[in-house]
């Protein structure tokens, strides 16, 4: 046995009620487990208890016991925790300590006073394990998201700990890089026999490689401790607002019964011949029509080129239009230039060449403040946007800057907080929120300004399925009923599939596609070029012999959209807060 929580509870110093309640969990040596649950369910808190951040960096009250290799951790100092558990954080930038990759990997060895003669081969061997041996002199801050993950992983592997804890390792990664990360974790697990604990929202992506168990948490309690096959065959994921794999959703929509003994945790192990007639009949009965594209142009981009360093172009001769009332996505791998487009539209940086106009007006003629009256941008990292201590004040900030009367501000802020599932937290300090809740605060602070063009940069990062569905269904309603134009910058294929109608694809700084979303998602070669992957919906259609993959995906989207609109009057239960 490696890890055991026995009747373990924890209450943050700043909260009245415990965040973890009577946890009983046993993890055997060499197991690979995944912990899932809604935002604020206690997943990350459990991880912080395991790696010693609680109680050493984060104060609170504990009861019960946590043992690692049979030793009670209560008397452990931080050094004793780090000898046993290595952690790769969701925000890898906050984990770097060295000026170069080599220095960062060597940090733990330097703390142990390892000689340079012994240190160099250890650093090089560890870097090779994660395919970084040719990059030891580069700065970790200059790397892509996937490369940063590998640097963080190398930094803990060099210390040869027995337990590896990954806190949402896929949150900021494009699909192909995410797959590679899961493969690296799985290879390490098989080759070293280390105990692996993964905390993650993206269950389908984690199940790219097999895991032993899935732990489902809600409200600080363990709801289920079972196998991947059993949880996918049960209603638990839907009941607790966890996003199930796309192929499972499609099979259920088609009327297929999913049983645990059918091994549903992988599309390759499912008895698809058994489901084939049912799926084909479901599709044959469809009348899927692609959505109509509005005619009026809101944003026109022509020949946009920009370089950060004057040498390599971050964007090169990019042209596209955004129609008024559209819901579009900009796709591409980490570092492809997607976020550069946002910065140029905002006016934070100026294009080297090319033009942008909105409602026929050249954006270069507008100040950043004037642009902000027309364009609202929700950044990927909520901590980069938040400037106030209290939630209400943060959401009201933009309206107060516009000189609106306080009575009107209060009414508008309360309306948006209610729509975003944050009304009950309006008098809370922002630091008492989870990462996902902070994300919703930033979205609320932009929505309250009623922009003509709303840009969401990776809106699902740190969000669970229930809450991002609630949020994006609300934005979808604004788009449908009020004509708000929405542009999502993302590499979350599931999100793009569910909500957007057209995809602008950027690869290596160039525009490689501007087409209906289902057409893009039916082009494996194009997706591969952009470091994206086909969805399991496309793979399912192919495996059951449906040639019109475009139509199959559109039918599924239409059915899902109809379900969302039926539920649009329902209020989703807001996530629980954590400090």
From Swiss-Prot:
Localization of this protein: Cell inner membrane
Residues that coordinate or bind ATP 1: 37-44
Broadest EC class assigned to this enzyme: translocase
Domain ABC transporter: 3-244, 299-533
Chief localization: membrane
Family the UniProt entry places it in: Belongs to the ABC transporter superfamily.
Designated name of the protein: Putative ABC transporter ATP-binding protein VPA1482
Lineage, opening ranks: Bacteria, Pseudomonadati, Pseudomonadota, Gammaproteobacteria, Vibrionales
